[in-house]
Amino acid sequence: MRKSMTQSIPQDPIMLLSFTNMQLRDHFKNLTEFCNAYMIDEAHIIQKLQLVDYTYNENTNQFI
């Protein structure tokens, strides 16, 4: 049975922020591509990072 990619990303919001921004910077054109590659719900990432007061900025392709 294949492991869900969600289990491969950090669950702690601050670690998730760092991981996500690094992936966006180095490998993906936008958040949608990142979420598709990791098979995770975009709304889940957005909500989790909003808990620590970060929002996705399309212009910079980062959570700021």
What is each PLM-predicted segment?
Residues D41-D53:
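Short acidic, Pro/Gly- and aromatic-enriched capping/linker segments at domain boundaries
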Residues M1-R25:
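N-terminal acidic leader/helix
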Residues F34-C35:
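Short alpha-helical "recognition helix" segments of helix-turn-helix
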